[in-house]
Every structure is written in C-alpha cells, then in structure tokens.
Amino acid sequence: MRKIEAKRGLDIECKGWEQEAVLRMLYNNLDPEVAERPEDLVVYGGIGKAARNWEAFEAIEDTLRSLEADETMLVQSGKPVAVFKTHEEAPRVLISNSVLVPEWANWDHFNELDKKGLMMYGQMTAGSWIYIGSQGIVQGTYETFGELANQHFNGKLNGTVTLTAGLGGMGGAQPLAVTMNGGVVIGVDVDETRIDKRIETRYCDVKTHDLDEALRLADEAREKGEPLSIGLVGNAVDTHKAILDKGFKIDIVTDQTSAHDPLNGYVPQGYSLEEAKAIRQKDPKQYVKEAQTSMRKHVELMLEFQKNGAVAFDYGNNIRQVAFNDGLENAFDFPGFVPAYIRPLFCEGKGPFRFAALSGNPKDIERADEEMRKIFPDNEKLIRWLDLAQEKIAFQGLPSRIAWLGYEERAKMGLALNKLVRDGEISAPIVIGRDHLDSGSVASPNRETEGMKDGSDAVGDWAILNALINTAAGGSWISFHHGGGVGMGYSLHAGMVVVADGSERADRRLGRVLTTDPGMGVVRHADAGYESAIKVAKEKGIKIPMITGKGDK
C-alpha cells in the first residue's frame, strides 16, 4: 500500500502532456483529499475503485510513463491488458469496467469474479480517472434542488428543512447544494468520518450525535429563514423513524446512501460500522438480506414523510428498486430526480462539463472562471453558480471546476481553455471531462433514463454509441462501465476526457469531442420524441436522418 498524492508542477514524467494528464488524474482520484478509502484504491460509492489492485495500479503507472504519443493502452476492469500502435489523434487510453453479459449482470456474479481478482467496480468516475471530489456532483445537486424549489417553494428553499442520508463522495454534495439554495438540511450518516470530511471541506456546517439537537438547530434556522447544514451521526432508519414519531415537519426527503451496493455500501439498522464490517466478511448473504430489509424500512419511512406532505424523490441510488424487490409494492410512488427535475436540461445537451488544472495552481482555475464569465455573460444561472462556487467550494486534490454547459457551449469553452494554455495565461494543460451522469451517455431505467417518453428506458445502445463516437472524435481517454450509481444490472454508461494542451491538434480534438458528446444527448432525447430536443437539433443543425434529414416522416 502506498500513499498517493495529486502531482503538481510543470515537470512531467511521461513522454507527453496527454499521457501525463492521465497519470495525474489517476493520482488525483486517490489523493487523500479526494478518495474515500485510498488505501484500498476506493475512490467513492461503496467500492468504486481506480485500479483492480496495487499490482495493476503500478502496471498502469509504468505503462503510462512509457506510452508513446501514437499508442493506446487498453484497461479491462482496472488492469492494463494491452498497448497497441494507433495514431496521435486516437485516445491514449480506452477503459472498460465491470461490464458483464446481461444474464450474469448481478452482484453475486460480480462478487465471485471480484474475489478471484478478475473484475473491479469502477462506479462512474472512479475507474475512469476523472473524479474531482464532491464538487463534481455539487452543481448538479444544486440545479436539482433549485428546480425543486421552483416547482414547490416559489424558487427558494428558505424556511424549509430537507432530510437526507449518505454523506460520502456523492451524497456529500447535498448539504452545500441545499444551503446554496437557502434551505436547512439534516444529513444522516452512520460513518462519522464522512461527516468530518464534509465539514473540513466546508460542505457541511455542523455535526452532532444528538437527534434532538439536530432538530432544534434545524427548527431555529427554518424559523429565521436562514441556510444551515447539519451532519447527524446515526443510522437513517433509526433517525427517520424517530423524527416521524416526534411529529417534526420535514419539507423535502431524499437519500444518497450507497444503497446501490447492499453488501459493501449500506449499513443495516442495528449495526455499528465495526459490527457491519465483521458480519459482511463472516456471512455476506445474511448481511445482504439485512441490508435489503433495512432499505425497505428506509423507503417506507420516506413514503410516510411524503404522506405527511414532504416532497420526496429518489436521488439515483436505486433504493426504491431494492425496497420493491424486498416486497414493498409502492416503492416507486415517489419519482427519480432526473424525470422530476433534470430531463429538460438533458434535452438541450446540458450536463456536467468539468475541468481540472494539471499545474495544481488555483490561479489557473481563477483565470478559467474569468473566461467563462466573458464567454457566457447572459447565462444568469451559470454566473450565480460561479459566484457561489468561488465563495463556498474548497478544492479537493487538483484545483477544478464544474459548470453545466450545453451543446455548442462546451466546445466553445474547451477551445477557449486551449487558447489560454497556448497563450500562457494558464500555466499548464487542462483536462476536460464529465461525470457519466450526462444527457446522452447513460442507460439507467431507475435514474437517468427513467420514464422516457417513448418507453426506451432500458435501451443500452445509446451509451455504447456515445463511447464509440467520442473515441472516433479523438478523446484522450474514453471509458465504458456497467453498474455505476444504481448497481449491477441496472445501468450502462460512458465517460470521456480530452486534454487541452494548447496545440492545434488539441483544437481539432476538442472541437470534435465537445460537439459529439453533448450532441449525443440531444440526439438521444430527440429520438425519444422530446420536442425541446428536436427543436435544438433543428436550430443547431444536428443531422438526425429520420428527424432533421431526408428521412423525415
């Protein structure tokens, strides 16, 4: 086991900045500021890992150091398996993580392979080396709660209390996103170290072990209309039931525990962390059974809050499905966050454009933020987001920024960043990527593609086409994963990263990839019959043969 830290500075150890970018982002994923359990190669999301094991990690490092500018490394579930001669505008790395043949696409079979050292769970950005800590999800979370506020609370969350659980790498964005929208939030986590990490990075305001204190603080802040985030140490089933029994009014309820992984992600009611770890190893089948029972109770309690007037929604961890499988027939009585709040953005190709400064210099991100303000001066939501981000977001690992941008906007920003690198206004290359949660890169019937207009929720072709077109367009590293966010059997998804190194070649690649990638979001939703996506496709000249081309019907 080694301690890995994000590498900074202008000296490189690889044969070019593109290979160096891959290495630095791999290191960044495992920096203690970023990763949840770096000693186990776990980045976030239960057992979402950056490499299969330490031997594979070191082989990836060595391969990247010797990789030529016209070669491509292939990574199979966290292990480097080949290097082939390709060409300079091809990806330097192609990654496939946790992909199983459908009949075998379940946790039991995955766990068998994992034990044999044959597979790794890549989550979304853990195994694709573009995780940037909680900031990576916080704007999407901010947008979600902002749209919820628009629909239910006249545009602001002031005077409301949100109840949620799970403050890990993904869920840790919730406290800050709610307070950015003016609300109060109680975030429950059984693992105190996770709450501590959110407080250290300014995502959460206060911590308590005492439910009564949490409710008192929440009520006082609600009465004053002031934002406040409270990390409450406890098990969600226990705390949620106690809150209901006390008759305390909850306005919004959701959840981001690692419910997608009943064995490694969710701690059943009645267990301490230590006890959970022991039984997980001693009797995994019993553990899963107890976790599923707890999740059913958890969803039952969320439904009770909904019955009492709270706005309830699933935040994409598949907890409804687990509860349904455990016999709760009305588990899907509250919606997922994508159909409820995010899909209109997806129809425009909008999604989580993110970038990181390979120099490690925060001034490079400041300059990029300044450029974004110049390019999009009329985008009020974006400007407000940048104001809030600069004030409230602490960088984890390499300095980075996320900003939801749409079709044409991403390419415009990517080319602008490349010019800043070329002109020396940014000191070293920038990597540009995104979460796999995006408009055209996921098939996930209980999350991103829940309730599609044409019933195409489970069609996996789109995620594969996204990876293929971004490879053809010349991304720097492209990934295709199974099971991220919602667990084995429930999702297929693709990721892309492209490096802005200031070169003319990078201009070509950025222009292509940052057009094809959001373009797939517009195409996917236009094909499903969303009028707003069809309108964008026609206005922007996206060629969709049977919608905008000669194949019109």
Swiss-Prot record:
GO CC terms of this entry: cytoplasm
Transmembrane residue ranges: none
Named cofactor requirement(s): NAD(+)
InterPro entries: Urocanase (IPR055351), Urocanase-like (IPR023637), Urocanase_C (IPR035401), Urocanase_central_sf (IPR038364), Urocanase_CS (IPR023636), Urocanase_N (IPR035400), Urocanase_Rossmann-like (IPR035085), Urocanase_sf (IPR036190)
S-S pairs: none
A single GO BP: L-histidine catabolic process to glutamate and formamide
Co-factor note (free text): Binds 1 NAD(+) per subunit.
Pathway given in the UniProt record: Amino-acid degradation; L-histidine degradation into L-glutamate; N-formimidoyl-L-glutamate from L-histidine: step 2/3
EC id: 4.2.1.49
Locations listed in the record: Cytoplasm
Record field: catalytic activity: 4-imidazolone-5-propanoate = trans-urocanate + H2O
Gene3D superfamilies: Urocanase like domains (3.40.50.10730), Urocanase superfamily (3.40.1770.10)
Keyword Transcription regulation: no
GO molecular function, one term: urocanate hydratase activity
Residues annotated to bind NAD(+): 45-46, 123, 169-171, 189, 194, 235-236, 256-260, 266-267, 315, 485
Keywords assigned by UniProt, alphabetized: Cytoplasm, Histidine metabolism, Lyase, NAD
Cytoplasm found in the keyword field: yes
Family: Belongs to the urocanase family.
Function (record text): Catalyzes the conversion of urocanate to 4-imidazolone-5-propionate.
NCBIfam families cross-referenced by the UniProt entry: hutU, PRK05414.1
Protein's recorded name: Urocanate hydratase
Organism whose genome encodes this protein: Staphylococcus saprophyticus subsp. saprophyticus (strain ATCC 15305 / DSM 20229 / NCIMB 8711 / NCTC 7292 / S-41)
